[in-house]
UniProtKB/Swiss-Prot annotation:
It comes from Gossypium hirsutum (Upland cotton). Pfam families: Ycf4. GO terms for cellular component: chloroplast thylakoid membrane; photosystem I. Keywords: Chloroplast, Membrane, Photosynthesis, Plastid, Thylakoid, Transmembrane, Transmembrane helix. It is a multi-pass membrane protein. The chain crosses the membrane at residues 22-42, 57-77. HAMAP family: Ycf4. GO terms for biological process: photosynthesis. It comes from the Eukaryota. Its main location: plastid. Belongs to the Ycf4 family. Seems to be required for the assembly of the photosystem I complex. This is Photosystem I assembly protein Ycf4. It is found in: Plastid, Chloroplast thylakoid membrane.
Amino acid sequence: MSWRSESIWIEFIVGSRKTSNFCWAFILFFGSLGFLLVGTSSYLGRNLISLFPSQQIVFFPQGIVMSFYGIAGLFISSYLWCTIFWNVGSGYDRFDRKEGIVCIFRWGFPGKNRRIFLRFLMKDIQSIRIEVKEGIYARRVLYMEIRGQGAVPLTRTDENLTPREIEQKAAELAYFLRVPIEVF
């Protein structure tokens, strides 16, 4: 999603609140909870889940392994839920032609660097760069090349844009910023 006028272009970034992250967090939470309950019921010798009789699963080694997988899954699930709650990676890119400033803002993990704010002068932008890696896991990433500071990514690596979409986005941005496009 983006907003545009003659002199300002604001590109909003989604971050970790994507449908796929919600699905993985739910699947991981309930799957690991099931593993932990089966491991615990094999230890107690009572049926905590009616699907599996506890006599069929011996605590050593199956119950211990299932309990370990359940605990590990709950930790990973809680990490996913925290990134969704904190909305890590979301933010915006603001290109202001009138003031000659580019601002890039992202939310990070809580702590000292929770707010990531980068500010550049438009005259320091050398080019808009498209990096393409073909293969089974094709990857197309849009970068902004800054004089003296290297390349700043403008799209996520997991954002699966088609070649036409990435070219369109790069062309519009390069036209707006009045800089050339490079393809690698």
